[in-house]
Amino acid sequence: MADIAEHAGIKHQIYNEHYNKVPNAQKVAELLDADPAVTHVAMVHSETTSGILNDIEAVGKVVKERGRVFIVDAMSSFGGVDIPVKDWGIDFIISSANKCIQGVPGFSFIIARRDLLEASAGKARSLSLDLYDQWKTMEVDGKWRFTSPTHVVLAFAQAMKELEDEGGIEARNRRYTENNRLLIEKMGEMGIRPYIDSTHQGPIITTFFYPEECHFTFSQMYEYIKDRGYAIYPGKVTEAETFRIGNIGEIYPEDIEKVCALMKEFLEEYNHEEN
C-alpha cells in the first residue's frame, strides 16, 4: 500500500510492527492525534507473509472516533473470515475473486460507503484505479470500462454458489480453522513450531520455523513434497528460516493429514541419509 501511495504521489506515513505482532490500536490513535492532516487509514486484515490476523475491529474504532476514513485490504480474508463491515467502521473494503472466495484471480471488488465513493469523483490519480468512474460505468451499462474478464466472472459466480452451498462464511471459516488447528498439531508432533502465537494466528496461512538443527534446504523439502502432489510456500520473515502452508481453497482435513505425512516422511528420509 505504501508503494501504491508513493507511485501515486500521495503523502503518507508508515506504521510498522514486527511480522509476529499486530498493529496497536492505541498507537494508531496517538499517530492520528499527533497529525490532523492524516485523512485516511489503510491496513491489511490477513497478512499472508506471516499468517497473522490483524485486529481491524480495534483499529477501526479509534479511526472512526477521530473522524477519519478507514480502508481495509481483505484480499486474503474476505469470504473466509466474518467481517461486519459497518459495525467495525470500515469505509472501503477491498478483496479479490480468488483466495477465500475460491474463484480464480482476475478482478478485485470493493464494498464502499456510497457517500465517500461519490465524493471521490474526479480525484483519481490514474485511469486504471479510478474507482468512481468504474462504478458509474457499472451503474449505467453494467460492464467494465475496458475488456470484461468474462471467464473470471463466470468462475466467481460458481464460487459464490459453492460458498453458499458450503454454509456461507461461518462454515467455511470452521473448515479453514480446523485445517489450521490440525496442521499446527501435526507439525508440533514433528517438533515444528508455528511462527505466530495462537492469539493472533489466522486460519488462512500458517508460517512455521524450520525444525531445530535441520540441515536441509527449502528447495529439497519443496521438491520432495511437490513431487508427491502438494506445494508449500517459502517464507522469510525473520532471521530464522521459515516456510508457509496454506489452509484455504478446496482443502480439507484429509489433505492436511496427507501433507503432514509427507513432511514426516521427508524428515525421516533426510535424517536417515544424514546419519
Annotate each PLM feature.
Residues 1-37:
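PLP-dependent aminotransferase-like
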Residues 22-79:
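Active-site phosphate-binding strand-loop segment of PLP-dependent enzymes
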Residues 86-98:
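Conserved active-site segment immediately N-terminal to the catalytic lysine
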Residues 98-185:
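Active-site C-terminal subdomain of aminotransferase-like
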Residues 193-224:
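Conserved PLP-binding catalytic core of the aspartate aminotransferase-like
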Residues 228-244:
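Conserved PLP cofactor-binding pocket of PLP-dependent enzymes
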Residues 241-275:
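PLP-dependent enzyme catalytic core of the Aspartate aminotransferase-like
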